[in-house]
């Protein structure tokens, strides 16, 4: 297992490790470097692939006008001292598959990645992107033993962006003028909060009828599957990478942005010992606080139903891992 022949990354510069050099991981590496946020270590188990991608990205630095170092490696030792570790490794979705269908394969991958990464970067903040997202984040939390403020999953930023995009398309407005938030699990039981969705401060309930809003909510819930069915060879990667880069940026630059992320809850929203999407303030320490919104009875019920589904899959994943360890 060898590292890239590229120049070594300087120890005094921010470093982001991305585990998994697939389409999400490699696109995220590009986003982080071109935003000039940090040097990047791109790690994958396939020899030569992360090294080749890193070289390709390095050759674009002059065009994109940044001087961030990017290395590709198959060795976790090269990730040492990272401020942030992003886990994207895992089997991607295929047509007809739900995110939960990925549970059996990806549980082992994420646990091994988390353990290896924390051994070399014990002070890092972890962001999990692998599906099923909420369960994988919980498993990574268990595997690393990290406090809950230093581990989170990327889901709500992406789901909210999809909801905003569909609202903008429906109304023919600038997407940046639309603000929306999606809570809950990253799947069919997510909870888009239409009451909090606005266009330049105007509630969408003043602009769209109830049937149209419900149609947009359903499209948001199926947003990932819609892309998988169209592409046939994999899932979304541009928007997931962009969503993750927003989280990385808020942490590295200590922006304290309020973003919906998958977080481990300890009583918030009446939920305990589960990872679920909620609004969090992200800064240099990771999750600085969890914001508890006032939810309607229907929204609260939806969030609790979503959490119950995640709990069931956590139990399934733990059984799978226990059986693998005993075999």
From Swiss-Prot:
One MF term in the entry's GO annotations: L-malate dehydrogenase (NAD+) activity
Catalysed reaction, written as an equation: (S)-malate + NAD(+) = oxaloacetate + NADH + H(+)
Active site: 186 (proton acceptor)
GO biological process, one term: tricarboxylic acid cycle
Keywords of this entry: NAD, Oxidoreductase, Tricarboxylic acid cycle
Binding site for NAD(+): 20-25, 44, 106, 129-131
Record has Heme as a keyword: no
EC number: 1.1.1.37
Keyword NAD in record: yes
Residues involved in substrate binding: 93, 99, 131, 162
Alphabetical list of PANTHER family matching this protein: L-2-HYDROXYCARBOXYLATE DEHYDROGENASE (NAD(P)(+)) (PTHR43128), L-LACTATE DEHYDROGENASE (PTHR43128:SF16)
Entries under HAMAP family matching the protein: Malate_dehydrog_3 (MF_00487)
Family to which the UniProt record says this protein belongs: Belongs to the LDH/MDH superfamily. MDH type 3 family.
Role according to the record: Catalyzes the reversible oxidation of malate to oxaloacetate.
Protein's name in the database: Malate dehydrogenase
Lineage: Bacteria, Bacillati, Cyanobacteriota, Cyanophyceae, Nostocales
Annotated gene: mdh
């Amino acid at each position: 297992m060898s590292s890239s022949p590229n120049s070594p990354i300087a120890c005094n510069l921010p470093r982001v490790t991305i585990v998994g050099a697939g389409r999400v991981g490699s696109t995220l590496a590009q986003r982080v470097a071109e935003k000039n946020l940090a040097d990047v270590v791109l790690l994958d188990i396939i020899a030569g692939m992360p090294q080749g991608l890193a070289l390709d990205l390095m050759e674009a630095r002059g065009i994109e006008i940044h001087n961030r170092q990017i290395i590709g490696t198959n060795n976790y030792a090269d990730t040492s001292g990272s401020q942030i570790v992003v886990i994207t490794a895992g089997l991607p979705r295929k047509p007809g598959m739900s995110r939960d269908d990925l549970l059996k394969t990806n549980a082992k991958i994420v646990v091994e990645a988390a353990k290896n990464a924390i051994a070399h970067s014990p002070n890092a903040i972890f962001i999990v992107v692998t599906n099923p997202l909420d369960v994988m984040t919980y498993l990574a939390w268990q595997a690393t033993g990290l406090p809950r403020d230093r581990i989170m999953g990327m889901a709500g930023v992406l789901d909210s962006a999809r909801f905003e995009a569909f609202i903008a398309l429906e109304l023919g407005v600038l997407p940046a003028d639309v603000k929306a938030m999606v809570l809950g699990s990253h799947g069919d039981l997510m909870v888009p909060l239409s009451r909090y969705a606005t266009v330049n401060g105007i509630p969408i309930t003043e602009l769209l009828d109830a049937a149209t809003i419900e149609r947009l909510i359903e499209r948001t819930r199926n947003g990932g599957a819609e892309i998988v069915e169209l592409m046939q060879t994999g899932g979304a990667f541009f928007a997931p990478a962009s969503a993750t880069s927003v989280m990385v940026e808020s942490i590295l630059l200590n922006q304290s942005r309020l973003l919906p992320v998958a977080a481990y809850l300890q009583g918030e929203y009446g939920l305990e010992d589960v990872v679920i999407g909620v609004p969090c303030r992200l800064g240099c320490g990771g999750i600085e606080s969890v914001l508890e919104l006032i939810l309607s009875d229907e929204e609260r019920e939806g969030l609790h139903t979503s959490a119950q589904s995640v709990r069931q899959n956590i139990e399934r994943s733990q059984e799978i891992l226990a059986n693998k360890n005993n075999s």
